[in-house]
Amino acid sequence: MTRPCEYGALDFFIEQTNAANSIINPKLRERAFASMGNTVQIPVINYDGDVTVGNVRSCVIEDDENTSELYTVVWATYTIGFTMVPAAYTNNEISYEHDFYRKMEKYTRALADALDKGAIAALEAQKAHVLKDRLNYDFSGNVIKVKKEMATEILGDIDPIMRANCYPRMLHIVCNAGIESLVRKLAQHGATNDVNKQLEYAGKKFHYTNNVTNESGQNGTFFAVEDGNIGVLTRVDREALRRTRANFHEWDVVRLPMIDLPVGSHYYTSVGDQSATVGAATEDLTCAVKEYFGFSVDVAFLVAYNSDPTKVANPIIKAQIAARDQNEPLGMPVYVTNAAAFPGGGASA
């Protein structure tokens, strides 16, 4: 039995790449895709924090030139592949198509999982180092540490925290099951309840993945990312780009199930002794055809360039929620507005 999971971080990067406000323009995407063998560099302008506002008019306007850099794209290569022996499916209860589909599914799932982990690693590496206003949360190790008593507040508080860092636009939340559990409990307290806790997560888009893991003592982890600040570049090998056909080898550019990214494919056949493929069922295949299916892609997960992340906040904030004791329910805060009406509950009459 196979159960493909959700790969929310990967899907998020792909979605943001294709968005109208993407940091990756079509020209860069096209140039990068065909760049195998070359170094891809993106011209960027550094942050200048020394701008002076004067209070006296003058006939002389001073120079203040920007400084630029060439940001080098760092690639990671991902490869998968499998083989098929067509004759092995003659007089076989499992058809060629069924086995091919299952092999394609398991390898594609493994690739999606690896890419999702790569996307999360990019978020982890580029999370904010500074918070201009952390409210009343602990911020250590570049992570917001949320006490279990404040679990119901962090999804609402992440908006003003991001806004204080000058990121006021829509937020995406890349998170795990612990955060989904929290959202579902908040959803139970709507507009007709004592307190409308749905406002805590309203206006955000959630991207769920099992690859956002909790550290020891944590019950939920998420990355908050402002819309329009990330993207992903891909490139394929030169023969795939050329769609080469030679010596019974075929290269192409394809899209795999579950992964909306172009990858390079390589197909060829050979003839040889395939009798050991699946034991006794193929012992007669001493001279048979074998098919080879290979797929590869170079991937670079990008976050908006920041020349001084120790002073200027990145558009990503990581937060962790402390774990409750086992079988301890999530407690919703109760706000008593007329405490004075109860003995010992407020100011004396």
Predicted regions and their residues:
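Alpha-helical scaffold segments that mediate packing/assembly in large oligomeric complexes
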Residues: 90-164, 320, 324-349
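Sequence/fold signature of self-assembling virion shell proteins
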Residues: 3-4, 8, 146-149, 184-349
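A general structural signal for short secondary-structure junctions and capping/turn motifs
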Residues: 31-34, 162-166, 276-282
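Extended, solvent-exposed, turn-rich assembly/linker loops in the middle of proteins
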Residues: 129-205
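Ser/Thr- (and often Asn-) enriched beta-sheet segments in non-cytosolic proteins
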Residues: 39-41, 72-74, 79-81, 136-138, ...
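N-terminal "assembly arms/tails" that initiate or stabilize quaternary assembly
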Residues: 1-73, 216-217, 312-316, 320-349
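Residues in well-ordered beta-strands of folded domains
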Residues: 43-45, 74, 83, 174, ...
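Short acidic, glycine/tyrosine-flanked loop/strand segments centered on an H-E-D-like triad
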Residues: 65-95
